[in-house]
Amino acid sequence: TVCRDKQENLWQIAFRGVNDQPFWAAFSDAPKDDKERADIINRMIRIQLAMIKKATGEEDPFVRMTFYDELSDLLAKGYLQPPTGKNMLWTFVAGRRDHYPYDDLVSFDTTKQVKLGYYMNLQFTSTGAHLAPAEGPWKMEANYRYVNTRGPLTFSVVNAGNLREFVMEMSANARMMWDMQAYNTDSFLIDFCSQYFGQKYAEEVAKLYHDYYYAYWQQKLSEFPGMERQFIFQDLRYSRVFDQIGKRFSDFSPNPLYDIGFERVPGRSFRIDGNNQVDSLIAGMKKTAVRFEEVSQRCENLLKRLPKQDQRFFRDNLAA
C-alpha cells in the first residue's frame, strides 16, 4: 500500500524474537555463540533490505536499523555488520537500565557511509524510570551532545509511555532537536517554568526541578567521562527491591537482589556498588530520603502561592 500510493516511508530492518527479546530466546535450536548469532542477523537484515529495494524500486531507500540491547552488544563486539549507504540510518540506543551512550556508539567508525540516529528512554516500563521522572534534561542533553560528536544527528527518538510526568523532559528534548546549537538546559528550564508558572516563580520552580533530580541516590559512581548521574536508583528499581525482598523476607541475605529475566549484563538490573546490598541500600536511602523530603516540603510551600490555574500541572509534573 505504501509503495502503490507513493507514500514517503522510513523502512526498518530488524531480526529479534517474541516479547522484545533476542531471537535465540524464541528458538531452541538457535546458536549459542555470539558470532554465529550475529551471522544469522546479518543474513536476515540483508534479505529484508533486498525486499524493500525490490518493492520500492529504489537503489537507496531510506532504511533504519535500531541497535537495541543484544544488537548493541553484538555491534560493539564487531560481529554485527549492518548495511551501509547514503540513506541507511544507524540508530544507536542509550544503555539499558541507566541511559548513556553505549559501547557500540563509543566505538563507532565515523568514516562509515551512514546517517546517525539515537534512541533514548526517558520512561520505559522495564528499563528505567516508570512513574516518576529520573533521567532529567541535563542528562538528556549530555547524551545528545556526545552523539553529535560522532556525526551529525539525523534521527532521534525519546521514549515515554506515561506522558503526564515526563512532559518537561520531552519538551526539553523537542527544544534541543529544534536548535541543538542554541539549546541550553538551564535556559530552557527557566523558559519552561516561565511559560507554565509565570516569570515571578520561574527561578524558584526551576531550582526545585534541579534539586528533585539531584535528590536521587547515585548507587554507583559515574564511569562515562563527563556525565553526571550516570547511574541512579529510579522508581522501577525501588519497586523491584520491594518485590524481591518481600519474597525472601524471612531468609536474611546481605545480597538479596538478583537480576531480572533476560538480563544480558550481570548486575545491571540494580548496579549497586559494594559487596553488601543491604548496607548500601540503607545508607543510600538515608541520604536520599532527606533530600526528597526537603524538596517535597518546598513544593508544598510553593504550591500554596502559585496561581490556582497553575497548581494542577505543578502538582502532577513535579510536586506529586
Where are the regions that the model predicts?
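Substrate-binding groove of N-acetylhexosamine-processing glycoside hydrolases
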Residues: 48-320
